[in-house]
């Protein structure tokens, strides 16, 4: 990852954000970034975090977002970095209610077909996902959960333990 380069020409202020984020990670501190829409904050925070993980300054990246559009931009940022050589496994965790196949989220084997026998099948589902995919978004998780007849949310959490980056859409 040390040879991974920023995938765009730097816009005004981006290099400062990238440098600040990397320095913040390396010194185990916190940073607050405020900049106008369109500056490139997402890539300017994800890129140095990826480089920091590559330098052994962290193990995983957690990208928290409250908006669908921000989640999508984060997914796209990781995708662009992958096109430039990044070898990361990335998962997007969304709210249980948004992943649940049922009308009501009653997570128990008596009320939920997807919870019934979940533990018998989930390891195979996670193994297949892990060995065939690198990005685990909502659609991919739903597809494999249906295929294996497991709870998509619980499968998502099981898979999240192993990935390099978690995009967490908490709405």
Model-derived features: where do they sit?
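Short, well-ordered alpha-helix to beta-strand connector turns
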Residues: 28, 163-164, 170
């Amino acid at each position: 990852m040390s040879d991974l380069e920023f995938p765009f020409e730097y816009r005004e202020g981006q290099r400062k954000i990238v440098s600040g984020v990397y320095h913040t990670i390396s010194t185990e501190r916190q940073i607050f970034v405020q900049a106008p829409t369109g500056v490139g904050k997402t890539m300017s925070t994800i890129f140095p975090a990826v480089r920091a993980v590559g330098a052994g300054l962290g193990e995983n990246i957690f990208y928290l977002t409250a908006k669908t559009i921000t989640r999508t931009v984060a997914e796209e940022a990781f995708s662009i970095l992958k096109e430039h050589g990044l070898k990361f496994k990335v998962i997007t965790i969304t709210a249980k209610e948004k992943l649940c196949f049922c009308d009501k989220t009653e997570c128990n084997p008596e009320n939920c077909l997807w919870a019934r026998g979940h533990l018998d099948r989930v390891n195979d589902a996670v193994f297949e996902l892990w060995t065939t995919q690198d990005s685990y978004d909502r659609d991919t998780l739903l597809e494999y959960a249906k295929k294996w007849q497991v709870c998509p949310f619980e499968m998502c959490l099981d898979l999240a333990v192993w990935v390099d980056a978690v995009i967490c859409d908490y709405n």
